[in-house]
Amino acid sequence: MMNVKEAIRNNLMVELDKCLSSLIRYDVDSLMPLFYVLCAHHEGHLVSIVGEGKSLFHGKMHIQPIEIVDGYESPLLKEIRNSVNPSFFEGQSAEAVFQFYSMCNEYINEFYQDIIEHIISVYTSNAGKYSGVSVTTQEIAQLMGYFISDCAPRRVYDPCAGLCSFAILPELSKIEFVCSELSNRTKVIADIRLNAAGKQLEINQEDCTFNWRGNSNCDCLASELPFGLRLNDRSLDERRPLLLEDFVIGKFIESESLSSAVLLVSASTCIRGNNKHIRKTLCEKNYVDAVIKLPRGV
């Protein structure tokens, strides 16, 4: 029999899905007003969604900046608000958020992390790899988390952090992470996710190929690397572009501080002709403990 808490949570998710169906269009920008209101409420602010007409239900609705309402806005709220055009915080987006918030604000804090994870899950599953948001599936994150934990690292470097799926794993809560992420929109959502999980972590928005942090007192390299992403490396023949996967593995080989690595790479990394020297070096130095081939579609 379903208990009261479970029933409340289920009803909350139903209302959240209604809101998401109104917000989700073609990119993640449409979700930012919802993230903003949720984070503001979680921080204890009085969220103000007002109508610009004579009454609340006539005229265009508008989500007021917390800075105007309370005189202070946290760095996270400011980051969310400044990540998109102000027009996303008014009109239909504001109305959809208002409908959800007015019905469910009483339970937001109780299920806050579940709400954030659900929004990310729904959006990435709908938009797929074209969403522009990189998220490691829970099953893969837990599998890789097991191996990361087994390495007993002090500090982990993730050069392609995405939504920081490893950093929020409970079993890795005591391990320090150094994260780099190229996409600003992904970084913003990762910051929201980390905040919901209670994880204090600064993500560096940068290109890891230009600013490699693997030597920042890190002893473990862990990442889900973008498959087949080509780099323009002037030191190579332009007809044979270097892939990011090969670049990261090469940096691991060169590193004096990184003693272990847990990487998710494309299957072609094990057979490509133009990275044969990398695979040969890994074998000669006895750096490979295991290669696990995942089922198709995982």
Language-model segment annotations:
Residues 1-52, 266:
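Non-catalytic accessory regions of SAM-dependent methyltransferases
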Residues 20, 145-149, 253:
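Generic structural signal for well-ordered alpha-helical scaffold segments
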Residues 128-223, 228-230:
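Conserved S-adenosyl-L-methionine
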Residues 134-139, 239-246:
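Conserved phosphate-coordination/catalytic loops
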